Amino acid sequence: MSKIESIRCILLSASYGNANHPEILECFPNGPKRTIGLVEVLLENGVKGYGEGYLAVFAPKVFKSITDLCKPYLIGKDCFDIRRRVADLCSVCDYWSLQGAARHVTSAIEIALVDAKSKSLKCPAYDLFGGSKTDEIEAYGSGGICDTKDHFREELDLLNSLGIKKYKIRAVKEDILRTAWILEEAAKHGIEVGIDMCQNLADPPQKVEDVTHYVDEIKKISDKKILFLEEAIGPTNPEGFKELRKSIGIQICGGEVITTPFEMIERIKNNIYDFVQPDASVIGGMTAVMEIFSETKKHNIDTVVHAWGGPVAIMANYQCAFACHGKLVEYPMIPFKLEEEMFSDQRRIQNGKVLKPTADGIGIYFSDDIEHRYDFDDEAVYSCVVAERGQPPDEYWKDNNLK
């Protein structure tokens, strides 16, 4: 047992991609800089644990406000009783945020408690959940927000250098020639392609028939199989996901925005997905992700953790995957300066596999120096009101090598 002495929110901003990257043009109106939100938990034994909530990428000041609201209810309590501390947070927040923003803060605090407890016990975080079940997990490259052939080729070169053989791109229903082109181009490297259709950000989201038409048109010009379709329709249409599973013969996945294990488990029981994508920085922390792994095993489907946050969120999700014998994890491809600072030597990729982290805690490094050099910029905020980025028409991707 070790009591919680203090809790504080830390907002950090760092360079992300470059000014001409399509995601920056779409979602970062103030330029190529991204913010993450951490929670630092200091124990009476002097150990510090760190967690992250994905909310801070989009609403950093909201993240800080909710953290400040919650922290008086945890000071002086036992860090090692993590389930009890999560219950305390639910008592504070569930009436007014049973789903949504407060769950991201609960996630951050829970991850910080796991980090602090495992550091205190001098073991990697996965040991708190029964130990790692494997020494390596296959990675898929997560990128494909590309408006030129050269940009796609640069990302394929990066995947080749790491030995990664699966690649997720972003596409919408109009991107028929673009998708066919990258399916063919990636196949030259022995790389399979999955599609994130990003319908969590669409208003209104596309319909089931839009997706089936998109897939049918691609099949007319490329014989390369799409590996999976992620968030192909909006999250409020679970029956549409079920219809897609029955009709198009491609793995259907989603779930990154779901903020409670209950909701995701209900979707699993309803046979909505071929695999699910929980995120420890969203759904309530690492213990919540463990619940999802346990449930998917009962239904013979896979859990592939979503890992598009900052370094702390990524490593928390990887720790869950190692504890539960995950088969695949996400590797974000847009350069984010804080990654090289905070991963240290703990995120290693060899021959397309993420190697098991071995440091105590969740496997991240943090210091006063990092905090001072990456101080919060209140303009470095992701905007979900997606701007027109000036992408080329689909005809740009027409290739004589396509059918």
PLM segments and residue spans:
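Metal- or metallocofactor-binding catalytic centers and their adjacent structured scaffolds
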Residues: 42-120, 395, 402
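Flexible C-terminal active-site loop/helix
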Residues: 2-12, 16-19, 31, 310-403
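Short beta-strand elements
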Residues: 37-44, 347
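Glycine-rich, aromatic-flanked loop segments that form ligand/cofactor-binding clefts
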Residues: 101, 106, 110-146
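Metal-dependent enolase-superfamily TIM-barrel catalytic cores that perform enediolate-based chemistry
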Residues: 130, 135-243, 247-248
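Shared catalytic-loop signature of beta/alpha-barrel
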Residues: 225, 234-253, 258-365
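Motif-centric detector for short Cys/His coordination patterns
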Residues: 1-38, 54-59, 75-79, 89
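Conserved, mostly hydrophobic/aromatic
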Residues: 46, 70, 109, 122, ...
